[in-house]
Amino acid sequence: MREIVHLQTGQCGNQIGAAFWQTISGEHGLDSNGVYNGSSELQLERMSVYFNEASGNKYVPRAVLVDLEPGTMDAVRAGPFGQLFRPDNFVFGQSGAGNNWAKGHYTEGAELVDNVLDVVRREAEGCDCLQGFQITHSLGGGTGAGMGTLLISKIREEFPDRMMATFSVVPSPKVSDTVVEPYNATLSVHQLVEHSDETFCIDNEALYDICMRTLKLSNPSYGDLNYLVSAVMSGVTTCLRFPGQLNSDLRKLAVNMVPFPRLHFFMVGFAPLTSRGAHSFRAVSVPELTQQMFDPKNMMAASDFRNGRYLTCSAIFRGKVAMKEVEDQMRNVQSKNSSYFVEWIPNNIQTALCAIPPRGLKMSSTFIGNSTSIQELFKRVGDQFTAMFRRKAFLHWYTGEGMDEMEFTEAESNMNDLVSEYQQYQDAGIDEEEEEYEEELPLEGEE
């Protein structure tokens, strides 16, 4: 019941995806070949959300792995969990997108997209009651950004009523992988605003900070970063995979988290994060988890929620946690930090509980926040975009693949609209005079 089909596109998406499958295979008691050797009935009860049962007690992920070059795929196949995936579900090209969004979205990616959709269709047909799709990708490159967004819009066309969740690695403020990142990211956000239902924003710099500051790793590897992301991904879907007192699924999450359809970009966090040596010195309690997960240092996207306000939040607790304690803590957070929550959505923290903690922890919590401060992130990318676009730098790579400058202008203005929508709701109060709204009404109709 309630299956999720997982897609991973591009190098970043495949690496995060591989870490994610490693994490949840462990939670469900599967070894690296997908054979069950767990101890608890609960691990099997809702295995079908992410896994198909094959013959011989083997479980196969409902995952579609996509890339425009074979390199990353080979790495996944050679990795510790390479034997887990169904070989037909690897779909790859040979040419690569070369960090060019247009190649991923219009030329190279468009040639491969039908093969991917065939695999997606086959996975969807193997489901009892498909709940939706989740896709891991980055927004700065060519394949994950360009082809990832193409897949999202194609899947949207074919499955209009299913949820579409994306785990998107957004460009970091200081660390840039490629010069054309602002272009790729802006073009991607332009697509995500229209086609995704919930986008969890992650960025490498924030992850580096968490690794250095909290986990005390002197030089974190991508493996460490991916481990953090997979912890969050596992937390977001935990309620689907294990029975709990207060369940939530992708759709419930969206209903509770998205007050206006375009504003579906979330910040995520995870607690407890402690350095490996310090585990034994701490007892984890609900107040401590709450404090850590509402800590700006714990957010996996580089925007500080103290510069904005929360429209909505969701807190997912795992482990032996008392319902009452959670509710008290949430009330506590809201009353102490009321200035960080918009007052026109009362009680805007949704909670979910699940009895089974992640491996190696007694209890944990996952935080998802829809904060207006995420606009900082878009603003930053938008400014970099404008700086390059004004001089038409690097544009020939995109126009050469058949793109039009108009598209860039549209993407830019869509992103600016998004920023100003966040700003508008950040400033909106509950007791504003009626007259103000009457003047503002025409704004709504422009879209």
From Swiss-Prot:
Chief location of this protein within or outside the cell: cytoplasm
Role according to the record: Tubulin is the major constituent of microtubules, a cylinder consisting of laterally associated linear protofilaments composed of alpha- and beta-tubulin heterodimers. Microtubules grow by the addition of GTP-tubulin dimers to the microtubule end, where a stabilizing cap forms. Below the cap, tubulin dimers are in GDP-bound state, owing to GTPase activity of alpha-tubulin.
GO biological process: microtubule-based process
Binding site for Mg(2+): 69
SUPFAM superfamilies hit by this protein: Tubulin C-terminal domain-like (SSF55307), Tubulin nucleotide-binding domain-like (SSF52490)
Protein name as annotated: Tubulin beta chain
Source organism: Hapsidospora chrysogena
InterPro entries, per database record: Beta-tubulin_BS, Beta_tubulin, Tub_FtsZ_C, Tubulin, Tubulin/FtsZ-like_C, Tubulin/FtsZ_2-layer-sand-dom, Tubulin/FtsZ_GTPase_sf, Tubulin_C
Compartments where found: Cytoplasm, Cytoskeleton
Protein's gene: TUB2
Description of how the protein assembles with itself and partners: Dimer of alpha and beta chains. A typical microtubule is a hollow water-filled tube with an outer diameter of 25 nm and an inner diameter of 15 nM. Alpha-beta heterodimers associate head-to-tail to form protofilaments running lengthwise along the microtubule wall with the beta-tubulin subunit facing the microtubule plus end conferring a structural polarity. Microtubules usually have 13 protofilaments but different protofilament numbers can be found in some organisms and specialized cells.
Cofactor(s), names only, from the UniProt record: Mg(2+)
